[in-house]
Amino acid sequence: MVCPNSNPVVEKVCELYEQISRLENLSPSKDVNVLFTDLVHTCMPPNPIDVSKLCQKIQEIRSHLIKLCGQAEGLLESHFSKILSSYENPLQHLHIFPYFDNYIKLSLLEYNILTKNTTNIPKKIAFIGSGPLPLTSLVLATKHLKTTCFHNYDIDVDANFMASALVAADPDMSSRMTFHTADVMDVTCALKDYDVVFLAALVGMDKEDKVKVVDHLAKYMSPGATLMLRSAHGARAFLYPVLDPRDLRGFEVLSVYHPTDEVINSVIIARKLPVPSVPLLDGLGAYVLPSKCACAEIHAFNPLNKMNLVEEFALEE
């Protein structure tokens, strides 16, 4: 495995990594914004690079860089979620988020892929890893899926509190948006209720963790339900984890789309396969058995009445 140090993109990414890793904090600031904007622009152009073939040193840099990107993205979303919540109707001001247009394009892309591969409008969607500014759910709910209920899952209670505040003033959105504080690995029975599950790009910060999440979803999602995943391709894999479609055990991969514009994430859509009546051997020699559902209690924010409930995720013009 040869490390292509002569590759100018890899060299530029490593240079930016050194500068980013020296920052005292990753909260929005001029220096943070300039460095991450430069990083995105460096990784955005289509590039045949296969990050899995890079040397160990670059692999370690990539792994750490993805974590730094995730931290910076979370801080940026929290910053703008707080600003938006100061408006009387936050949903009318989502455009102030600097990457809002990217979410408009990504949501349209995902909606088109979803409608091409499914026959019915989903009644209930789960978004795993929704964060303090759940733009995908908000854009899909307001522009494309206007009768669908969205259940947003995040492990961070503060993120859910901020997100729920954004829809509290809107009667329609607050009635269709629910926010659950939970680790997805603890969510079992509830997953059977969703027609579509979205998995955010930064849920599972490396391939191993992401595959564990996918395997968990395969255990508990209903047969025939749809899984939408975000991955990365080429140099964009320095920004987000990569998920190989071959790692989607228990799912039939329907389509994989790699954007070449400013939409960074690749999109994978898959369908949950039926559970075999006779246990089958998986690739590791272990039996794949139908799972027994042990319901857990998960606290959800209901922004309509602000009470806590107990409940068990080619672009067309």
Curated annotation (Swiss-Prot):
Superkingdom, natural source:
Eukaryota
Keywords per UniProt: S-adenosyl-L-methionine, Transferase
InterPro entries xref list = Nicotian_synth, SAM-dependent_MTases_sf
Q: Name one Pfam family in it.
A: NAS
Annotated GO molecular function terms are:
nicotianamine synthase activity
Subunit structure of this chain's protein: Homomultimer.
For this protein, the record's PANTHER family field holds:
NICOTIANAMINE SYNTHASE 3 (PTHR32266:SF12)
Q: What does this protein do?
A: Synthesizes nicotianamine, a polyamine that serves as a sensor for the physiological iron status within the plant, and/or might be involved in the transport of iron.
Q: Which family does it belong to?
A: Belongs to the nicotianamine synthase (NAS)-like family.
The protein in question is named: Nicotianamine synthase
Give the species: Solanum lycopersicum
